[in-house]
């Protein structure tokens, strides 16, 4: 599924307010909710080789689990100084569920007056009005709850994508340098979606044209290099790797699967990290919170062993 940033932001801004609802009290994150037409999915695409064998070892991914994962990626993206890899499958599933829930709410609102408010032959006008008002009041509350819950999910998704776009704008030349030199641990294709790559390419071209037309072409040739890093101040703005961040140590679901995880004498599990400047080893105990420099824990963050808070 292609991830179109423009379509995402436009779709999430669309007004989904409806006037009424049926009597079912279901939410967006409930696996047995009114989204019965949205089946549970797994983290693997069945069209990939050996995907059927992989699916046997993994349980289905519920909407609630996906939402919690989205919250974790959202917090990490907002707290990290660099652009983190995009969880493409997770974002695709969440966008599909958001769209399906929006359509479901609209279907409920359009069919409510037809199916729930029935005119009774022979009733007096006052009694009929009371019946209709009670039906409206009883059916509107569940729909309002569904809409409020959907708006929370849309807010998180919208904030997550805009935070990523802001980092692409801020570190456009740095990301361009990583792509040209290939010095990054992961490729730009894994770091960004297809639409984010197109946005980054167009933004960097516009920025380079602006710098060249306004400043660089009026300077001596030896000073026109936009990627000059030989002076005291680099021409390319990089993320602040020395930034201090709060981390929560998750640890793996199965301690036997992580060779880096060690066990202390009192039975607690921890990770060893080294602070190069002091040649000091620090133990990060699972389930604990620490304040560390980002460059020290970024590898643990990418492996999912810690999360930013």
UniProtKB/Swiss-Prot annotation:
InterPro entries recorded: GINS_A, GINS_bundle-like_dom_sf, GINS_Sld5, SLD5_C, Sld5_GINS_A
GO CC term (a single one): GINS complex
Coiled coil: none
Keywords on record: Chromosome partition, DNA replication, Nucleus
GO terms for biological process, alphabetical: chromosome segregation; DNA-templated DNA replication; double-strand break repair via break-induced replication
Highest taxon of source: Eukaryota
CDD domains: GINS_A_Sld5 (cd11711), GINS_B_Sld5 (cd21692)
Subcellular location: Nucleus
Main location: nucleus
Role: The GINS complex plays an essential role in the initiation of DNA replication. Has a role in chromosome segregation.
Subunit text: Component of the GINS complex which is a heterotetramer of SLD5, PSF1, PSF2 and PSF3.
Entry similarity comment: Belongs to the GINS4/SLD5 family.
Name assigned to this protein: DNA replication complex GINS protein SLD5
